[in-house]
């Protein structure tokens, strides 16, 4: 078939075709081709290959294909999409397009009834002769070659992308961190790591992921093994089709649950932030100091990101059932709950052994959130302008309510959650609070688990107990809390607070201002 096609080409050019032999001579020159058919190097290569036998053409294309694969192994960054290519190669117009398309269809393309061309080597369908010409280079030649490593490509865009490997150029940069990459799609995938939501959800167990690749790995690693073993899933398959009204209700419930967990997690984040180096800001030289808005915005964004992640993990782990009764609690009954819990604790005999096993983690979480709510109510009551003076009756009752709530919480913690040093610390705290609740006259008598009385150092200003004299000394002003002149004066920046609540808030925030003389 190739011989007949070569004869047809010779008739078009007006010259006779030389005799075809099995082994062509090395000194033979390529067959002359008219100018309208020799527009590109691909057409010249195809016209030259018509002089040989069909078997020789197949051998040459196979060797060129192997060389192309070797070039891809040497440094091509991404695979080329050879299914449907855009008409971005060399363009022909008028009669050149018709003649070129007929020549290409005769060389290596099969014209389909819909007008498209099909490659006779791999069967890929191209929309036009120019696209087929570019595609044929993947089987024969790669004209765009890297002058540094020798890697060859069929398109110029792939070569330019490959050159960035040698130059180290990364034009696409993330505006949230220091990540930079060479491709736009890689940056798009990286930006998903900064998002809070997890759109890709597993329909087998309900876990969510930010990237689809992570979800696919999760399915291959876990669920394929469970299905092969014939084990049922952790929960039934979740239907993807949901009603918009149900989704809106779920979002409202999640918002209420997040507000309850926020009080508990805010203290942990504040402690983590206060442990970092303090930021000193001057009043006079504030404008002269260098300010990088990107760093501060990044820090705030990462802090909120950590908070959102912690809240989502807590809600996913604990579930919504343990938090839903607290959402429905009316505001008027919040002040009665701590009193009821304290009365229940005073009449309950202390148990020497561990708590019973029927107390679950949800009970502990309910009590924990209940206690945090009681603390917030008592703190608001003491911080109000009408009660700015220190009333001994109110403060003692509030402290008693907090101690009773802590004792109630300690007795209801799941025994499986206690181990090692944490168990000893909880037992010590339990002994301290039990001694404080049983005898109000001797409220600061601390007894260890062995029955020995421990010495306690109390801060009269903050109402905090210390079992270590060193920590008490640090707290009182040697290294930074209370000042020597005023107990509510910051020893680091000299800020004066009106009460202990403002002083504690100032220390927790960790932003100190110093006055330059």
Swiss-Prot record:
Compartment(s) where it occurs, according to its Swiss-Prot or TrEMBL record: Nucleus
Annotated consequence of substituting residue 184 to A: No effect on pericentromeric heterochromatin location. No change in DNA binding
Effect of residue 152 to A: No effect on pericentromeric heterochromatin location. No change in DNA binding
Outcome following mutation: residue 140 to A: Abolishes phosphorylation, DNA binding and pericentromeric location. Loss of DNA binding and pericentromeric location
GO biological process, alphabetically ordered: amacrine cell differentiation; B cell differentiation; chromatin organization; erythrocyte differentiation; establishment of protein localization; forebrain development; gland development; hemopoiesis
Zinc is among the record's keywords: yes
Effect of residue 155 to A: Loss of pericentromeric heterochromatin location. Disrupted DNA binding
Tissue spec. comment: Strongly expressed in T-cells and their progenitors,in B-cells, and in all early embryonic retinal progenitor cells (RPCs). Isoforms V and VI are the predominant isoforms in lymphocytes.
Result for mutant: residue 179 to A: Loss of pericentromeric heterochromatin location. Abolishes DNA binding
Effect after changing residue 23 to A: Abolishes phosphorylation. No change in binding to gamma satellites A and B. No change in pericentromeric location
Outcome of swapping residue 13 to D: Decreased binding to gamma satellite A by 5-fold and to gamma satellite B by 3-fold. Diffuse nuclear location
Renumbered residue ranges of the record's region Disordered: 1-71, 376-400
Effect the entry attributes to changing residue 293 to A: Abolishes phosphorylation. No change in binding to gamma satellites A and B. No change in pericentromeric location. Increased DNA binding affinity toward TDT
The protein's role, per its UniProt record: Transcription regulator of hematopoietic cell differentiation. Binds gamma-satellite DNA. Binds with higher affinity to gamma satellite A. Plays a role in the development of lymphocytes, B- and T-cells. Binds and activates the enhancer (delta-A element) of the CD3-delta gene. Repressor of the TDT (terminal deoxynucleotidyltransferase) gene during thymocyte differentiation. Regulates transcription through association with both HDAC-dependent and HDAC-independent complexes.
Protein name: DNA-binding protein Ikaros
Gene for this chain: Ikzf1
């Amino acid at each position: 078939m190739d011989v007949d096609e070569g004869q047809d080409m010779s008739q078009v050019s007006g010259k006779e075709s030389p005799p075809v032999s099995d082994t062509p001579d090395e000194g033979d020159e390529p067959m002359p081709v008219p100018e309208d058919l020799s527009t590109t190097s691909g057409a010249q290569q195809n016209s030259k290959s018509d002089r040989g036998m069909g078997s020789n053409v197949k051998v040459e294309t196979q060797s060129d294909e192997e060389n192309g694969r070797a070039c891809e192994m040497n440094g091509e960054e991404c695979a080329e999409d050879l299914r449907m290519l855009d008409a971005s190669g060399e363009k022909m117009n008028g009669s050149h397009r018709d003649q070129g398309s007929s020549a290409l269809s005769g060389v290596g393309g099969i014209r389909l009834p819909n007008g498209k061309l099909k490659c006779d080597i791999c069967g890929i369908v191209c929309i036009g002769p120019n696209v087929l010409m570019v595609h044929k280079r993947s089987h024969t030649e790669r004209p765009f070659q890297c002058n540094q490593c020798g890697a060859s490509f069929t398109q110029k865009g792939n070569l330019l992308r490959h050159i960035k490997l040698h130059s180290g150029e990364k034009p696409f940069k993330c505006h949230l961190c220091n990540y930079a990459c060479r491709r736009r799609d890689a940056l798009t995938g990286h930006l998903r790591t900064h998002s809070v939501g997890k759109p890709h959800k597993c329909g087998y167990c309900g876990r969510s992921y930010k990237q689809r690749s992570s979800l696919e790995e999760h399915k291959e690693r876990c669920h394929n093994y469970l299905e092969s073993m014939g084990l049922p899933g952790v929960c039934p398959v979740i239907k993807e089709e949901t009603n918009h009204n149900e989704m809106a209700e779920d979002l409202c419930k999640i918002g209420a649950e997040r507000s309850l967990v926020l009080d508990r997690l805010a203290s942990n984040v504040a402690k983590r932030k206060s442990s970092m180096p303090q930021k000193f800001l001057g009043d006079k030289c504030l404008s002269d100091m260098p300010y990088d808005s990107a760093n501060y915005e990044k820090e705030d964004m990462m802090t909120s990101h950590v908070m959102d992640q912690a809240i989502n993990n807590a809600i996913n782990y604990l579930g919504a059932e343990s938090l839903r009764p607290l959402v429905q609690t009316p505001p008027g009954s919040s002040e009665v709950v701590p009193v009821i819990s304290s009365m229940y604790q005073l009449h309950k005999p202390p148990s020497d052994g561990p708590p019973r096993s029927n107390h679950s983690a949800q009970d502990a979480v309910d009590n924990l959130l209940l206690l945090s709510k009681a603390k917030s109510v008592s703190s608001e009551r003491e911080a109000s302008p009408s009660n700015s003076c220190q009333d001994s009756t109110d403060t003692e009752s509030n402290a008693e309510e907090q101690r009773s709530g802590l004792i109630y919480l300690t007795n209801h913690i799941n025994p499986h959650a206690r181990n090692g040093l944490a168990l000893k610390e909880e037992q010590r705290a339990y002994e301290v609070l039990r001694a404080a609740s049983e005898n109000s006259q001797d409220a600061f008598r601390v007894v260890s688990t062995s029955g020995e009385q421990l010495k306690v150092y109390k801060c009269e200003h903050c109402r905090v107990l210390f079992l270590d004299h060193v920590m008490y000394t640090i707290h009182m002003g040697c290294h930074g809390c209370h000042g020597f002149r005023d107990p509510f004066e910051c020893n680091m920046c000299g800020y004066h607070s009106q009460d202990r609540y403002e002083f504690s808030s100032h220390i927790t925030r960790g932003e100190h201002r110093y006055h330059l003389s």
